[in-house]
Amino acid sequence: MTKDNKTFEDRLDRLKAIVSALEKGDLPLEEGVALFKEGQTLSKECATQLEKARNEVKIVTGGEVEDFDVDTEEDTADDS
């Protein structure tokens, strides 16, 4: 699969795997740096894809896109 054919989810899954590997802290320096660089690239690509999706939603909704709050487990625990 070429880079251009990867979905947002593919990139996000790879980014999560990279973060997990880096958090373990047992990689050789060179491998850690290479993974960090790959992660930076993936992060930028995901941000670009999200911005494109947001712009598409703006077009479909006539420019009326409102931000919304996403309840997290912490948010719902704080409400109790």
Curated annotation (Swiss-Prot):
Pfam families: Exonuc_VII_S. InterPro entries: Exonuc_VII_S, Exonuc_VII_ssu_sf. This is Exodeoxyribonuclease 7 small subunit. The keyword Hydrolase applies. The lineage of its organism: Bacteria, Pseudomonadati, Thermodesulfobacteriota, Desulfovibrionia, Desulfovibrionales. Its EC number is 3.1.11.6. Keywords: Cytoplasm, Exonuclease, Hydrolase, Nuclease. It is found in: Cytoplasm. Heterooligomer composed of large and small subunits. NCBIfam families: PRK14067.1, xseB. It comes from Maridesulfovibrio salexigens (strain ATCC 14822 / DSM 2638 / NCIMB 8403 / VKM B-1763).
